[in-house]
From Swiss-Prot:
Gene: ureH
Main location: cytoplasm
Family: Belongs to the UreD family.
Function: Required for maturation of urease via the functional incorporation of the urease nickel metallocenter.
This protein's record includes keyword Nucleotidyltransferase: no
HAMAP family in the cross-refs: UreD
Example of a GO MF term: nickel cation binding
Cellular component, GO annotation: cytoplasm
Protein name: Urease accessory protein UreH
A Pfam family matched in the record: UreD
Location within or outside the cell: Cytoplasm
Subunit composition and interactions: UreH, UreF and UreG form a complex that acts as a GTP-hydrolysis-dependent molecular chaperone, activating the urease apoprotein by helping to assemble the nickel containing metallocenter of UreC. The UreE protein probably delivers the nickel.
Membrane-crossing residue ranges in chain numbering: none
Keywords: Chaperone, Cytoplasm, Nickel insertion
Amino acid sequence: MSSFAQKSILKLKTKRGLNGKNIIEEMFFTPPLKIISPLEDEDIAEIMLISVSAGLLKDDCQDIQIHIGKESKIRLISQSYEKIHDTQDGYASKHTQITIEENAFLDYAPLPILPFKDSSFKNTTDIYLSKNARLHYSEIICAGRVAMGEIFDFSELSSRLRIYKENHLVFFENMNLKPAQMAMQNICLFDKYTHALSMVIFDDLIEVQALEQKIKNSSLNVGISTNNGGIIIKALDNQSERLLQFKKDLAL
């Protein structure tokens, strides 16, 4: 493992090409971050963001800037879990800023966040939607390396999400988990579960009733609500794979 002395930066800008394909217009990244060339899946380009390191360490900082051009359709994925190692008396951080232009679509679906014992991680995401922009955002948080007996042994995990629609704040979620100060397995928090999925959807093409029916048929502990034109889905389970499969089965 190595801790990069400078802030790691990744910038990505996409556009709709003359042939109708979704292409990368601009990109820039510094170690250990990289961008894999897009794969076209029907009319959506799937782009993988990767990190060629074993995970985040103390004082590591990632700055991610994504710009989805007008009418382009992009699915962003990652190649591995976001591993947060022991940060000692400090913390690791990540800030993501996403702009989605008019009539563009983004499915943002990174693999789960995995905080190791004694780790601290601060994650902030700001998303700006233009007129008729569509967003499918998901985040999965693990209690730790459960198979190794590390269950809520991290020091702190905070995740702040702000979504703006035509420059008006329409969604704000602020989660701050401190296991030493909180009863994480209280019925009001994780209860008996170790993995949590959070999905936020702003998409006028999605019918809430159809989603509700799919959720009713799920074996997971899952709920759905609406707010300010958005759809919020929360799910709990003891395996990240089942949460990932649940999202896939929604077939959004």
